[in-house]
A protein has these predicted regions:
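Active-site nucleophilic cysteine motif
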Residues: 173, 185-204, 208
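Short, structured beta-strand/loop micro-motifs enriched in basic residues and often containing a Trp
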Residues: 47-57, 114-125, 211-219
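Low-complexity, Gly/Ser/Thr/Pro-rich intrinsically disordered linker/tail segments
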Residues: 269-280
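Short, well-ordered loop/turn sites that connect or cap secondary structure elements
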Residues: 60, 66, 134, 226-228, ...
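A generic structural signal for residues embedded in beta-strands
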Residues: 45, 74, 142, 234-235, ...
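Boundary regions of SH3-family modules and the immediately adjacent low-complexity/disordered segments
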Residues: 1-41, 57, 64, 68-73, ...
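A structural connector/turn signal
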Residues: 61, 129, 221-225
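...with weaker cross-activation on analogous glycine-rich loops/strands in unrelated enzymes
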Residues: 206-264
Length: 280
């Protein structure tokens, strides 16, 4: 089988597309020339949190992370690491291959952890040993039986950790209050600025991209004077959520945790004028 390029080469965001030079995904055949094309293979994260790195090395920089149950489409395996893309936000990185498993069909009912952390019990009892703690946002497939979900792959989670969770961005962000700042993090165990707002808006069904510059391309620009609670405020390399017109909730390296503080203080430290964007 062969493909013919449809026109001049286009630029595809390398953090979201396998567009070369070594790996080009099959979906880009006709747009990007390649000696061979690869069709990503669907796998799933089997550990509570899994760092996505810039290269196939445990010492490589963390660029994001997968949470338990999130799908990860891989195109290559090298040195015990898999190169792939998260289905949650299309972000590309390398993860430990041994922390992945074959993904089952996605046509079943999926449950999401809505607690800050949910104990994964060895049996359907609150007195059973805890084999892991699953973070907010973890995705679980399984069968509800009484008060517990029997998780596909093993373990049980209490149904109260899967229901009646935050229904808006403010409540979701509040779950992260005091969480450590962690470059590449997306959970209450450690989160960065773009990861925090991504997780907060996700409970409203709003899909934010992973990095601040990519998120800045989304939403609607709003004049600073017209800002309101729920808007996102951007600076170069940073973002936070307005909880009202003058206070910002954000994960930051100044306090090394998630805090809510005066917007004016953040702007003064940033040394740049903020840009406000609205997401509805």
């Amino acid at each position: 089988m062969s493909w013919v390029l449809k026109g001049p080469a286009q630029r595809f965001e390398p953090r979201e597309w396998f567009a070369g030079p070594e790996v080009v995904e099959l979906a880009l055949a006709g747009d990007v020339g390649a000696v061979r094309y690869v069709d990503p293979r669907p796998l799933v994260c089997t550990v509570p949190r899994l760092a996505m790195r810039s290269g196939p090395d445990a010492a490589a920089e963390a660029v994001s992370e997968l949470l338990f149950g999130e799908r990860f489409d891989i195109v290559d395996v090298k040195q015990g690491f898999a190169l792939g893309r998260s289905r949650h936000d299309r972000y590309i990185g390398w993860v430990r291959f041994d922390a992945l498993a074959l993904a089952s069909a996605e046509d079943g009912v999926l449950h999401h952890v809505v607690a800050r952390r949910a104990p994964l019990f060895a049996a359907a009892s609150i007195k059973a040993p805890v084999v892991a703690e699953l973070p907010f946002g973890a995705r679980l497939a399984g069968r509800l039986d009484g008060n517990f979900l029997a998780v596909e792959g093993g373990g049980h989670v209490h149904r109260r950790h899967l229901a009646d969770g935050p229904r808006d961005r403010f409540a979701a962000a509040a779950l992260f209050a005091g969480a450590p700042y962690l470059w590449g993090g997306r959970s209450p165990d450690g989160v960065d600025c773009s990861g925090l707002v991504q997780q907060a808006l996700a409970v409203e069904g709003i899909a934010l991209r992973r990095d601040t510059d990519l998120q800045r391309e989304q939403g609607e620009a709003v004049k600073f004077a017209a800002r309101e609670a729920g808007d996102l405020v951007f600076w170069p390399g940073h973002v936070g959520l307005l909880v009202d017109g003058d206070r910002l909730c954000h994960a930051n390296a100044h306090w090394m945790k998630v805090v809510t503080e005066p917007l004016a203080d953040v702007t003064a430290r940033a040394g740049a004028e903020p840009e406000v964007r609205r997401f509805t």
